[in-house]
Amino acid sequence: MEILYSPAKINLGLWIVDKRPDGYHEIFTLYHTLDFYDRIIIQEHPFLEVKTSMPEIKQEENIVYKAISLFESYTGIEQNLQVIIEKNIPVGGGLGGGSSNAATVLNYLNKKHDNILPEEKLFEIAVKLGADVPFFLKGGFAIGEGIGEKLTFLPKTLNEEIFIIYPNIKSDTKTVYSKVDKSILTNKGDLNIILSLINEYDIKKLEAYIENKLGNIALDLYPEIKEAYDFLNYLGFSPKVSGSGSCVYVIGRPTAEVEKAAAIKGWRLIKTKLK
């Protein structure tokens, strides 16, 4: 039996730079993994079975099942395994839990089979599974471009404390992206300040310029997200939405007021750090 830990991520910032003819959007985003995980248990089994603590997700629709199936197709090696995913990362929160699960299992399978697939083939599989999956093959701190799959991994990571509010609502990424119009597109030249600050690894300097244009749409679509965001603003924090939502994050530690509000509102408060 093997136990794997599958990390969450945060989009520290996200800018939309273009809309492609195929309907997808070109983005510029800053990915960073968190010290916060799902747990995955893998053991030998008579046949492939993927189970999760969310029984409403059918096996064939589970991204981990799809990842294993693609690995089988690329290698010709049948995987008779039972995979049990214990979810801790909120679903639909913009923290990449499912994508991380898929990448973690892909890395495990490739290592188990003596790195049968070169890195570029693993990335090829990851891109087929979803825009965030390639990032999780390595994790750490990275710039994501294209639809998020064109990655520049930075040599160092940040380690600041961070807290996250999950307002107990799932944000639908497709719905959020469908509301993007030309008025919120960012000229890539305007991101030069971000590129220069990244190399200083100073989150406080970077934070002053970080935006999430997609998150602004999520705030308009989901009153629950806006309520958490506005509350943190009221307390003097600089909250940001992660990805397309629904999680709202703040660099630093939560105050007693945040702890109390989370308990009253039924929000999930996650205290972690960049890793």
Curated annotation (Swiss-Prot):
Pathway: Isoprenoid biosynthesis; isopentenyl diphosphate biosynthesis via DXP pathway; isopentenyl diphosphate from 1-deoxy-D-xylulose 5-phosphate: step 3/6. The active site is at K9, D132. GO terms for molecular function: 4-(cytidine 5'-diphospho)-2-C-methyl-D-erythritol kinase activity; ATP binding. ATP binds at P90, V91, G92, G93, G94, L95, G96, G97, G98, S99, S100. It comes from the Bacteria. GO terms for biological process: isopentenyl diphosphate biosynthetic process, methylerythritol 4-phosphate pathway; terpenoid biosynthetic process. InterPro entries: GHMP_kinase_C_dom, GHMP_kinase_C_sf, GHMP_kinase_N_dom, IspE, Ribosomal_Su5_D2-typ_SF, Ribsml_uS5_D2-typ_fold_subgr. It catalyses: 4-CDP-2-C-methyl-D-erythritol + ATP = 4-CDP-2-C-methyl-D-erythritol 2-phosphate + ADP + H(+). It is an enzyme of class 2 (transferase). Keywords: ATP-binding, Isoprene biosynthesis, Kinase, Nucleotide-binding, Transferase. Its EC number is 2.7.1.148. HAMAP family: IspE (MF_00061). Belongs to the GHMP kinase family. IspE subfamily. Catalyzes the phosphorylation of the position 2 hydroxy group of 4-diphosphocytidyl-2C-methyl-D-erythritol. This is 4-diphosphocytidyl-2-C-methyl-D-erythritol kinase. It comes from Sulfurihydrogenibium sp. (strain YO3AOP1). The gene is ispE.
